[in-house]
């Protein structure tokens, strides 16, 4: 049986002589209601293939498997191997104890579609999700719990304070939304920040996707500069290119939608 409360997780770790790693940013999910909500928004049904990143103490891992999913779970902390092996015994769960940042998911994941379910610290979450959106087409749905401010960047609208490159990448490759917010007290130990679950459903890559993201990266690298300056290194004549698609050279990257960057990519 998987741990569902802070006390159960603390007891399980203590029994194995373990404690959460501050270095790894470990905050283990310890709330059955939040676990059920994640399983629901992920659309888990029998036969669904789930890539779980950050299995931790297995609270979500076991819930996914109990709902009928085939779970391939990655956990960077090999100390947790006996814990996860204990709580997932008899379930359709395949465990890997490696750093996911060193795994070529496009090669490792066979067939599809896959649903990524993850509880990620900031330093891992953003680059991992951006890479998977761009390069791992077999992942059809992303259900990712991260620090709230980070999660909101993937679903932000042009002109908002959270809007940036993650928003554009998500806007090009998926339809993103914040499913719900998660308070600190549902974790063990409790983090100092709120979290949120962002859901992204993949859409077919449109023409110009790679170029559009390159343009967005250049624009947000100098986000306070007007496009005519921030894109000077990627267009021979940026003013003409920008105007050719009905945009203003005095605009900034934060003013452009994903669709705007796609139009500009084809200029």
What are these regions (language model features)?
Residues 196-202, 207-240, 245-248, 253, ...:
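An accessory alpha-helical subdomain
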